[in-house]
Amino acid sequence: YFYKSYWPFIPPQSCIAVSRNHLNDIFDLLDFDLFPKIWMDFRIGIISKYIFNEFKVLNKSYTYYRQSNENISSNYKFLSKNWWNRRKEAHEYIMYFFKSNNIDHKKNFDYYITNIINKFL
């Protein structure tokens, strides 16, 4: 369990489909005042996995994702200081989410490594 990831594969927002039944419930659970670096797609994925127990990844392409230097994700280059900082905030969001929703959890290896690296940045 020490190595288990608590977050699912998160596709870009344009690739997420949500049933109408869950849409209002999801928006009720989204809180953007806390953890501002955590994007909506990540939050929807976590809510879908842990609250609704429904998270499916289809092996089909319905949209195409294009990366450019102008989009917001370009501020989070892999293993950069910003990337590690946002990853730490994602772990903090997960801990807050689990505690707020009474979901049993344990901190994993990634949590500890991310926090150690952030101490040196």
Where does each model-flagged region fall?
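Conserved nucleotide-sugar donor-binding catalytic segment
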Residues: 1-78
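Prokaryotic Sec-type signal peptides and long signal-anchor helices
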Residues: 46, 101-102, 113
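Catalytic core of nucleotide-sugar-dependent glycosyltransferases
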Residues: 63-69, 75-104
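Noncatalytic linker/hinge segments flanking ATPase motor cores
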Residues: 14, 56-59, 96-108
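Non-catalytic, C-terminal membrane-associated alpha-helical segments of glycosyltransferases
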Residues: 77-85, 107-121
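Generic structural signal for hydrophobic core residues of well-folded globular domains
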Residues: 51-52, 98, 120
